[in-house]
Amino acid sequence: MKFTRMVKPNEVERKWHVIDAEGKTFGRLVTEIATLLRGKHKPNYTPHVDCGDYVVVINASKVKVSGNKESKEYHRHTGYFGGVKSEKLAELREKNPEKLFKLATRGMLPKTKLGRAMLKKLKVYPGSEHPHTAQVKGN
């Protein structure tokens, strides 16, 4: 008789994935990133253990969006009265693509400590250069 075996946090093997965002559709790319961060692509996926991999996104400022999503607004609140600030997706992509990717990916991960730990494994860079070449070569 076979039993399903749950993986323990110290048994998880993490890989580094480099994803080039140039010319790719934003939403489809973010779902792929969320799957890798969560670890659902692995046969030993366990929901209560962070078994995901590290993801490095390069050329984040050259990602493509379809339809009229360029005008989609992201809202945040400063904490003061009347302190609602809004930014359009196009502005956010030019100014701070890391924030754009983290906001979109965060919505696809669990809203718990586990989700925050998974999001820390996402590294986003607007250009093609990144400081993680040593880790990526090790895979």
From Swiss-Prot:
Q: Any idea what this protein is called?
A: Large ribosomal subunit protein uL13
Superkingdom in the source lineage: Bacteria
Q: Which GO terms describe its biological process?
A: negative regulation of translation; translation
Instruction: Fill in the subunit field for this protein.
Output: Part of the 50S ribosomal subunit.
Give the originating organism.
Answer: Nitratiruptor sp. (strain SB155-2)
Q: What family is this?
A: Belongs to the universal ribosomal protein uL13 family.
* Pfam families with a match to the protein in the record: Ribosomal_L13
- Role this protein plays: This protein is one of the early assembly proteins of the 50S ribosomal subunit, although it is not seen to bind rRNA by itself. It is important during the early stages of 50S assembly.
Q: Which InterPro entries match?
A: Ribosomal_uL13 (IPR005822), Ribosomal_uL13_bac-type (IPR005823), Ribosomal_uL13_sf (IPR036899)
Q: What is one cellular component GO term in this UniProt entry?
A: cytosolic large ribosomal subunit
Q: Which UniProt keywords apply?
A: Ribonucleoprotein, Ribosomal protein
| GO MF term list | mRNA binding; structural constituent of ribosome
Task: Tell me which CDD domains the record gives.
Answer: Ribosomal_L13
